[in-house]
Amino acid sequence: MSQNTNESHLTGLTDQEVIASREKNGVNLLTPPKRPSIWKLYLEKFQDPVIRVLLVAAVFSLIISIIENEYAETIGIFFAIFLATGIGFYFEYDANKKFDLLNAVGEETPVTVIRNGKIKEIPRKDIVVGDIVILNTGEEVPADGMLVEAVSLQVNESTLTGELMVNKTTDEAHFDEEATYPSNSVMRGTTITDGHGIMRVERVGDATEIGKVARQSTEQSQEQTPLNIQLTKLANLIGKAGFTIAALTFIIFTSKDLYQYLTVTEVTDWHQWLEIARIVLKYFMMAVTLIVVAVPEGLPMSVTLSLALNMRRMLKTNNLVRKMHACETMGAITVICTDKTGTLTQNLMQVYEAQVDESQPELIAEGIAANSTAFLEEKVEGEKPSGVGNPTEIALLLWLNGKGQNYMKLREEAKVINQLTFSTERKYMATLVDSPIQKKRILYIKGAPEIVMGKCNLDKAQIDKYNEQLLAYQNKAMRTLGIAYKVIPENASDDCAELVGEGGMTFLGIFAISDPIRPDVPDAVKKCQSAGIGVKIVTGDTPGTATEIARQIGLWQPEDTERNRITGVEFAALSDEEALERVLDLKVMSRARPMDKQRLVQLLQQKGAVVAVTGDGTNDAPALNHAQVGLSMGTGTSVAKEASDITLLDDSFHSIATAVMWGRSLYKNIQRFIVFQLTINVVALLSVLLGAFFGTALPLTVTQMLWVNLIMDTFAAMALASISPSMDVMNEKPRRRTDFIITPAMRNNIFGVGLGFLAILMGLLVYFKNLPSGMDTHHLTVFFTIFVMLQFWNLFNASVFGTNHSIFKDASHALGMLSVAIIILVGQILIVSFGGKVFRTEPLPLNEWLYIIGGTSFVLWIGEIWRGIKRLGNK
């Protein structure tokens, strides 16, 4: 049925009108989100709090280097800074390039328009306001506009409202007053699922609805990531501790030496002043050394390396991470706000159940095949099935396909005499065919069950039985469809509407159709809930449908009440104070609009929640952008993907649970690295400080510490970052944002092990100092090597910190650690053998190497014994 405006003939715009319209209203292109320049992307890496502390240390080191004309230490510190920032920049830049390939926007898609009275195809980007566009089934609407003609037109608005099927018409009598957008309007980015129409373009590019949402999605969220907050606190702590100890050391030692010098010497000429300057400079250098030793130069690079390695490995689990911090932030999330269509469900209508007359399988098959305008697309094995046309009709064809029936063969063999397409007014579709199966002319009808049953010969008992079944389906938020047929005499009318109106049809049964939940979703939701993560469904669907989906995935429980669900309109009516009181209790928000979802995210954040948002539509973009982690779908719109941090390539909620596991495991690995790293810094700092009190030469130089803090720690970070994630972390509750990254157990380990190492090293230092020949470069080389080897063996203990596992329990884990350990050991041998003046070392004989390696290995064995005792205690 066609609905026309008063215009009987549409000629479209002339060439001159097209040019004028483009000048006045702009082009049909969405302004892409402003991407930071390459330099800005790189400079962002200097916002890392530990990098900033390093920069301060580098400035002090540079001052000393200029005075002494020895630049090795300063170069080392700057190398540390540029290496850490460079790695972070490279991996984010690389991810952005991959993302751009994934998100190629089809602005060249051809669109059929009427211009100069002729039908022609032009690229989507060339559409202008005033253009007359012809819309056919399966096509995407290229701009916003008003319909001037609509024939059985149905539109998939899920990218904007979450609605899969919206009826469109130009007949005011059939306008849907509750629709999000007027019934005679169509929006850019939506898809024609059934029928066809003609529209007049009213808005293009950024002026379209999709353009407005895209603009809101580029507003930057000011939320700091949980890891960033913790690293800032850690950097402040290290910075304050390092600078305080350095300042006190400088004041105490300078005061002592100056007092001793000035009590015996009278300052009369510049020679004495030069000696005073030498004393001040000597202890200023010591203070700078203490700062450099206190600051873990390798920490930012190691964290970056851990994040970067996780980015790569998460890609294998269908998580394309675009923003590096998102790897870890996923481990801290406390709430997931997810849309329904395509994330929890398969975004493919399917027959849930068929109550049909099983004695008539051939008639049912022919009726479904012939009385349909939909098509199934050819797919390779294993690929998700899909079709073109009405989603309900596609569901019936898929059901038929599953029965081993070839719908195309049946459709081609049944000669269509007449067809009455579905309309919202009639609520049925009818097709008259010459049936090769029955060798008769048959009228097939399908539509709303109550309409179809009204045309059939059914008694009250049969109608009551079907109505009871229909009510059960509708309570589960399913669509229902009835089918019937009638044999038509050859000399009868071939007007479908007239034949249906006569009644007397035979009812063949009912179908219950739904967009089924993904099979892995209930388990994934359960995992998230056991991990202490709240799941909230935010959808444009009806309250009934949204609640039913929540029930099916295990989110909605029998004890839940109206307090646990709300509609978008009701939510918008609440004040911020009222909404804040309810947000944590909400499980379902239905009829939600884009701004409702964004407001929900921001209110949850005000309550202290760390929020992840999933979405595939343009309507999800503002919320995706404001959440701590935005998760878009691989098949989602370009606007949604641009606003997100992670793209789920398989569109599955299950991948979110996997990402949480990765994030939590990554945080534990970073904590393990901090245990390893800070043990080194505590030992080094106190060694230098106590060495000064004992009156020895600086036991560790800045260049030696840069080797330990940079190169050795980089390999250690790689080893710890490569530890496989464990499902055990999903049994824990999310960490609180206020919890410091260094836990009491970590603090005890750092100072317990550190003080043990310090006692050994100080004993060694005192022994060397009291030798008759005194302490020389050989002794300092032995001291440096023992210091490194103690940390070397402690790396193995750090890799299983937080567990009672033996390092040898997992062969692949032990092998990975061993390969890194060999690299570190070879590096230490090379530095000792060839470091010379730069590293203040000299080569050691083989027997000393064996004594040092064997003697320091007690660190590993004590760790193994301690974990073994704890395992026995837990039995």
What kind of region is each of these model predictions?
Residues 1-733, 741-742, 755, 769-770, ...:
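Conserved cytosolic headpiece of P-type ATPases
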